[in-house]
Amino acid sequence: MYDRLKGFRDFYPAEMGPRRAAIDAIEDAAASYGFREVGTPAMERTEMYVDKSGAEIVDELYSFTDQGGRDVALTPELTPTVARMVVAKQQALSKPIKWYSSRPFWRYEEPQQGRFREFYQTNLDIFGTSDPRADAEVLAVAADGLTSLGLTGADFEFRVSHRDILGGLLAAFDATVDTEAAIRTVDKREKIERAAYLDDLAAAGLSYDQAEQFDDLLDGDDLDALVSFAGTDRVRDAVANLRNVLDAAETLGVRQYCDVSLTTARGLDYYTGVVFECFDSTGDVGRAVFGGGRYDDLIERFGGQPTPAVGVAPGHATLNLLLENAGVLPDDEFTPDYYVLQVGDTDAEAADVASALRERGNRVDTDITGRSFGAQMNYADNVGADTVVIVGEQDLADGNVTIKNMASGEQTTAPIAAFPGAHDAPRVEDFA
């Protein structure tokens, strides 16, 4: 007997229904805003992540040397891949480029609630515009996807920040600070003890007094006070940009979900401007449902022309936890609309009935094992078929089939020549 690998999951039909409903909701929201689907490889050259993603990702790579001697890795995230794709056809692609993709990723990390070594995300990216409306639009897609699943503003919140506010505040201190290290420390602020948090800020170059002052600034909600403290155009412009994004979110009807949270930093090194994370409002999920932000320099770092970009990536493990905690996890297990039951030598007639129902868009199961009448009825009940159509020799001799509603037990006969007839989804009451 072989055991499943730690951090990997099997999804049986009962689990796949809710997962598929959640994925479809996010993808449908993306498509409604004009995003187009792309497909991407499961593996890339390891050096791409070493060069572009930062230490946090590199330490968790599933990487190896392939049979051709190349150092390769299973993709731990999508942004570098789609950046590579944009660079490859940058001149031919119409701007702005709006793409989405749902697929698995892999990171070697310790499994816990909502975190697995193989995990699934729907990535949404916009390339080719720095307009704040693009930032607001990816938030709007995410919000529309969540609310279409039954969530409300009482269930989730978008915590929004700006990398240049953080970097500008750090630069205002009389210290030589490793800005990226300090921002990575801010990103894990809620995950480590305060003493360790201050130690890490000190290791990045701040004194302990400066670290305390910096943290106090992040806890405040007065953006004008931050501009005054820093006294630089960098922070002033970043605050103005953040406000413009929030104004655009208001226009799109999603400002109600957004809270300014300067301790939201995102740990990946390529983020440059506005960043955001979605959290469960109750705190029960315990980690971000998803995150994203602006990465205006990444295309150029891949060798392309300067191209501003922004993206977000809802994670489906944490999203399903959020839906479950809110009591709105979709109950969408796949079940047949019809089971066509055969009695006697009726293969041809049963196949014709099943084909006619399928042509009308129905999900139809049939017997492929030669089971008895009772065994077929038990199977139809077990797989949750709504309606059973019985195609038996005796009924056919009279020119009929029998239709049975599995929930109520009600049944009637219908002329086979008129079934399904004008009915796309024929029911017992249509022929009673």
Swiss-Prot record:
EC number, as in UniProt: 6.1.1.21
GO molecular function, one term: ATP binding
Main location: cytoplasm
Source domain of life: Archaea
Subcellular location field: Cytoplasm
Gene3D superfamilies xref list: Anticodon-binding domain, Bira Bifunctional Protein, Domain 2
GO BP annotation list: histidyl-tRNA aminoacylation
Cellular component terms (Gene Ontology): cytoplasm
Catalytic activity: tRNA(His) + L-histidine + ATP = L-histidyl-tRNA(His) + AMP + diphosphate + H(+)
Keyword ATP-binding found: yes
Family: Belongs to the class-II aminoacyl-tRNA synthetase family.
NCBIfam families: hisS
Name assigned to this protein: Histidine--tRNA ligase
Encoding gene per record: hisS
